[in-house]
C-alpha cells in the first residue's frame, strides 16, 4: 500500500486545491517542484528551498544512476540523506532523458540501450531497472518508465509509442510491487496531441492502477493551444481522487493555464536555468538583467517582493554588474528570486481556489502583464 494520501479540499471551475500527505511531510497543491537534477537545486542550499515555500523537490533518476551511482547514494541511505533534504522527493524514471539522447539510443521491447553522456559506455535501462534504481533512491513518488512521444509525430508513430509505454507501465507496476516499495507510483499518460490516443493511454493506465497520473509528452515543442487542448480533453477523464502532474511545463503562464485545467503538480528547470541566464520572473513580466537600461536602475528585481534578493535591497544595477562579471552571486540571487516568485504564484493560486476567486486571480495575473486573459473552453474572448 502506498504511503501517499491525497485530499481534494476545494475546486473553483476546473482548478483544484488539495493536499498530498507523506510520512516525510505534507505538500499543498497546486504545487511547483524545483528540479534538483544531480541531487541539488542549482545554486541554493536545501534550507533555502524550504524557506522559499517549496515542500517537494524532483530528482533525476537517469543522471544520479550514471553519477555518482547507486553504491554512493546507498551509502547515505538514499537520496534524502545524500542531498540533506528531509521533505518529499519525486524521481523521474529516466525516460525523458533517454528520449533527449535521440541519435545515441536504441529502443526495443525490453527497454533502451544508449551511450552514457558521462563516459560513452553502453548502458541499458528498462522498466525493471528504473524501478530498482528508484527503490535505492528511496523517493516518495516513483515515476513509471515510459517512452516520451516526440513532437511532431504521426498518429501511427504516437500510437506505437503509447502502446509500448503501456506495456512498460505494467512492467513498472509489477517490478515496483515485487520490490516491496511502498512509495507512490505514478502512471504517465502519453499519446502525443491525439485525443483518442490520450484516452486509450489513460484507460490502460487506470486498468493497471496507479497512485497518481502524470501527463507526459507536452513539453516537447508543441504549440500552447495543442497542449491546452490535451489538458481539456483529459480533465473530465482523469480520476478526481488522484493527483495530476503535468511534467516539465513551467512558464508562469503555463502554470496558471494548467491549474485552470485541473493540474495539481508541476516541475520545470525554467526558474533556475533562466536565473543563470539573467532572466528574472516578476508579476509584470520578465526582467532581462543584461539589457543596458538596467545599468543604473536602483530598483530591486520586483519592488515589494519578499525574496532574499529583493528584501535585502540588491538593485537591478548591482545584479547586472554581477552578471556581466560572471560572479556566482548573480545566479544565486536570481535563483532565490525566481523560485520565490514561482512558489508565491502557487500559494496565491491555492488561496484563490479556496476562496472561490480563481477567475478573478487569473484575470489579474494577465492584466499585470498588460495581456488579455485567454478564454477558457465555454468562454468568449
From Swiss-Prot:
Protein name: Queuine tRNA-ribosyltransferase
Organism, as annotated: Xanthomonas oryzae pv. oryzae (strain KACC10331 / KXO85)
GO molecular function, one term: tRNA-guanosine(34) queuine transglycosylase activity
Enzyme class: transferase
Alphabetized UniProt keyword annotations: Glycosyltransferase, Metal-binding, Queuosine biosynthesis, Transferase, tRNA processing, Zinc
Active site (record annotation): 92, 267
Alphabetized InterPro entries for the sequence: ArchSynthase1/Queuine_TRR (IPR050076), TGT (IPR004803), TGT-like_sf (IPR036511), tRNA_ribo_trans-like (IPR002616)
Gene that produces this protein: tgt
UniProt similarity note: Belongs to the queuine tRNA-ribosyltransferase family.
Cofactor note as given: Binds 1 zinc ion per subunit.
Catalytic activity: 7-aminomethyl-7-carbaguanine + guanosine(34) in tRNA = 7-aminomethyl-7-carbaguanosine(34) in tRNA + guanine
Alphabetized Pfam families for the sequence: TGT
Chain positions covered by the region annotation RNA binding: 248-254, 272-276
Sequence positions that bind Zn(2+): 305, 307, 310, 337
Matching PANTHER family: QUEUINE TRNA-RIBOSYLTRANSFERASE
A GO CC term attached to the entry: cytosol
Pathway(s): tRNA modification; tRNA-queuosine biosynthesis
Amino acid at each position: 500500500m502506498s504511503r501517499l494520501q491525497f485530499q481534494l479540499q476545494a475546486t473553483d471551475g476546473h482548478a483544484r486545491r488539495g493536499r498530498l500527505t507523506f510520512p516525510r511531510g505534507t505538500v499543498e497543491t497546486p504545487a511547483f517542484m524545483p528540479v534538483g537534477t544531480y541531487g541539488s537545486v542549482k545554486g541554493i542550499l536545501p534550507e533555502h528551498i524550504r524557506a522559499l515555500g517549496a515542500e517537494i523537490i524532483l530528482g533525476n533518476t537517469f543522471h544520479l544512476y550514471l553519477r555518482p551511482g547507486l553504491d554512493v547514494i546507498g551509502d547515505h541511505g538514499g537520496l534524502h540523506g545524500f542531498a540533506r533534504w528531509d521533505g518529499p522527493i519525486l524521481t523521474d524514471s529516466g525516460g525523458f532523458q533517454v528520449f533527449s539522447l535521440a541519435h545515441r539510443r536504441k529502443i526495443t521491447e525490453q527497454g533502451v540501450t544508449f551511450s552514457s553522456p558521462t563516459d560513452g559506455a553502453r548502458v541499458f535501462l528498462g522498466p525493471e531497472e528504473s524501478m530498482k534504481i528508484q527503490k535505492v533512491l528511496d523517493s516518495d513518488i516513483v515515476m513509471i518508465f515510459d517512452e516520451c512521444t516526440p513532437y511532431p509525430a504521426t498518429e501511427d508513430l504516437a500510437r506505437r509509442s503509447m502502446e509500448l509505454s503501456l506495456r512498460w507501465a505494467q512492467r513498472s507496476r509489477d517490478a515496483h510491487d515485487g520490490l516491496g516499495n511502498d512509495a507512490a507510483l505514478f502512471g504517465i499518460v502519453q499519446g502525443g496531441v491525439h485525443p483518442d490516443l490520450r484516452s486509450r493511454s489513460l484507460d490502460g493506465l487506470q486498468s493497471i492502477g496507479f497512485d497518481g497520473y502524470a501527463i507526459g509528452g507536452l513539453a516537447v515543442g508543441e504549440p500552447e493551444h495543442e497542449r491546452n487542448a490535451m489538458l481539456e480533453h483529459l480533465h473530465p477523464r482523469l480520476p478526481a481522487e488522484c493527483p495530476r502532474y503535468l511534467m516539465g511545463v513551467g512558464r508562469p503562464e503555463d502554470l496558471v493555464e494548467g491549474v485552470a485545467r485541473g493540474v495539481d503538480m508541476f516541475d520545470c528547470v525554467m526558474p533556475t536555468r533562466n536565473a543563470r541566464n539573467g532572466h528574472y520572473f516578476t508579476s509584470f513580466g520578465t526582467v532581462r538583467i543584461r539589457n543596458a537600461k538596467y545599468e543604473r536602475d536602483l530598483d530591486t528585481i520586483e519592488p515589494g517582493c519578499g525574496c532574499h534578493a529583493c528584501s535585502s535591497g540588491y538593485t537591478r544595477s548591482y545584479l547586472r554588474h554581477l552578471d556581466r562579471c560572471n560572479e556566482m552571486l548573480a545566479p544565486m540571487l536570481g535563483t532565490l528570486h525566481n523560485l520565490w516568485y514561482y512558489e508565491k504564484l502557487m500559494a496565491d493560486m491555492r488561496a484563490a481556489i479556496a476562496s472561490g476567486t480563481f477567475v478573478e486571480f487569473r484575470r489579474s495575473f494577465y492584466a499585470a502583464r498588460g495581456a488579455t486573459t485567454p478564454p477558457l473552453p465555454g468562454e468568449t474572448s
